[in-house]
Amino acid sequence: MSATGQPDNAIQMGFKPMLPGFDYAEYNNLEDFKSKVTENTIAIMIEPVQGEGGVHPATQEFIEGLRKLCDEKDMLLLFDEVQTGWGRTGAPMAYTGYGVKPDAVSMAKAVGGGMPLAACCATEKVAKAFTAGTHGSTYGGHCVTCAAGLASVTEILDNNLS
């Protein structure tokens, strides 16, 4: 909730104080993102397609620029695909249409086929930080939700629904 691009909104009500250290930049504005990067910046997290208040896809130039910036500054590029993942944009993940690989991607909603399920996929380098006992999930590993997730993803992939 600290990372939401809509600070001080209803999503955060009742949950303060938020974690410090988050900064926000204008979507699709690479120069604004660059201006916010400091020696303490470790990652940039965005939605490849923003879904609140309409449908707002990132430009190709913006996504490619973020990947280049993160590579140059040794930062992680994180994609939030909770709204757009698993076929909701006509591709398995919205980011796949950009030809840019994130360091990690979060997904939910469609991945569970209506059941409460979420996932985080990461590169091997990033995944090494997730050691046993350091990352938890409310619904992690539940047999019913995992079966629903497997069925949902299988249906999407086997029937070319993305």
Regions found by a protein language model. Give the residues of each.
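Conserved N-terminal phosphate-binding loop of PLP-dependent enzymes in the Aspartate aminotransferase
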Residues: 1-162
